[in-house]
Curated annotation (Swiss-Prot):
This is Olfactory receptor 4D2. PANTHER family: OLFACTORY RECEPTOR (PTHR48002). Residues 1-25, 80-100, 159-195, 259-269 are extracellular. Disulfide bonds join C97-C189. One of its GO terms (molecular function) is olfactory receptor activity. One of its GO terms (cellular component) is plasma membrane. It is found in: Cell membrane. Keywords: Cell membrane, Disulfide bond, G-protein coupled receptor, Glycoprotein, Membrane, Olfaction, Receptor, Sensory transduction, Transducer, Transmembrane, Transmembrane helix. Odorant receptor. It comes from Homo sapiens. The chain crosses the membrane at residues 26-49, 58-79, 101-120, 140-158, 196-219, 236-258, 270-289. Glycans are attached at N5.
Length: 307
């Protein structure tokens, strides 16, 4: 497509993770295993929480929603990456690239807001244990979950609205395995310094502030636990520790990628793999391995299926 003297690109080319065919095959097998594990682990959480009446509490309904987010988030990048690892030419259309950016930031933004809801849930459970069920009623937690999805949608629309007007007239080589703002922005045929600043403010600083507030919230919760009896304190502390691990796994890579100037660094791809592929797989493992109620529910589900 031509406008004046500019030839607009119709697609982008990924450099991917490796140019060596043998290594690409190995990476395909490894990440196929990771993606299958991600899908099965998160589906297991969704089915377990849905089918086990003992888990029909706000905390586990929130955990189920997190599993849905993890499943969808990994599916934005992993299937395309797997196909490209077996392909000679790794391309994505302009429309596909913008779509990937939209869903990546939609689900990533929803994840950020959703982790705040989970922190709020734990705060109510520990500070007001006798009123927990009353405060965290169905209307409230459903409203909070809907708000997280709406928040992610608004965040993504802002990202996309800033990207769509940009002209892309070449080159079209992306040194990555998926479309994301930092890499695509560098290919625009115009000065993007102001836009880069707006992107860092919209994503990076939001991540930093949100991460700090969440850590302070969990620190406050852990301090409050000192007044609880032994067994209740141990169980609540284990749950909070799990949440802190998950929050750190999600926010630290995101801060690295978006809270700095969009200059490429050698670690970028490795951090992106952890952020987009590994974390969605590890989240269900962390929650099931550290949560005795989830472990018991999974065993009950297994026995029920065998009967």
């Amino acid at each position: 497509m031509e406008t004046g003297n500019l030839t607009w690109v119709s697609d982008f080319v990924f450099l991917g993770l490796s140019q060596t065919r043998e290594l690409q095959r190995f990476l395909f097998l490894m990440f196929l295993f990771v993606y299958i594990t991600t899908v099965m682990g998160n589906i297991l959480i969704i089915i377990t929480v849905t089918s086990d009446s003992q888990l029909h509490t706000p905390m586990y309904f929130l955990l189920r929603n997190l599993a849905v987010l993890d499943l969808c988030f990994s599916s934005v990048t992993a299937p395309k990456m797997l196909v490209d690892l077996l392909s000679e030419k790794k391309t994505i259309s302009y429309q596909g690239c913008m779509g990937q950016i939209f869903f990546f930031h939609f689900l990533g933004g929803a994840m950020v807001f959703f982790l705040s809801v989970m922190a709020f849930d734990r705060l109510i459970a520990i500070s007001r244990p006798l009123r927990y069920v009353t405060v965290m009623n169905t209307q409230l937690w459903v409203g909070l979950v809907v708000a997280t999805w709406v928040g992610g949608f608004v965040h993504s629309i802002v990202q996309l609205a800033l990207m769509l007007p940009l002209p892309f007239c070449g080159p079209n080589i992306l040194d990555n395995f998926y479309c994301d703002v930092p890499q695509v922005l560098r290919l625009a045929c115009t000065d993007t310094s102001l836009l880069e600043f707006l992107k860092i403010s919209n994503s990076g600083l939001l991540d930093v502030v949100w991460f700090f507030l969440l850590l302070m919230s969990y620190l406050f919760i852990l301090v409050m636990l000192r007044s609880h009896p032994g067994e209740a304190r141990r169980k609540a502390a284990s749950t909070c520790t799990t949440h802190i691990i998950v929050v750190s796994m999600i926010f630290v890579p995101s801060i690295y990628l978006y809270a700095r100037p969009f200059t490429p660094f050698p670690m970028d791809k490795l951090v992106s793999i952890g952020h987009t592929v590994m974390t969605p797989m590890l989240n269900p493992m962390i929650y099931t391995l550290r949560n005795q109620d989830m472990q018991a529910a999974v065993r009950r589900l297994g026995r029920h299926r065998l009967v």
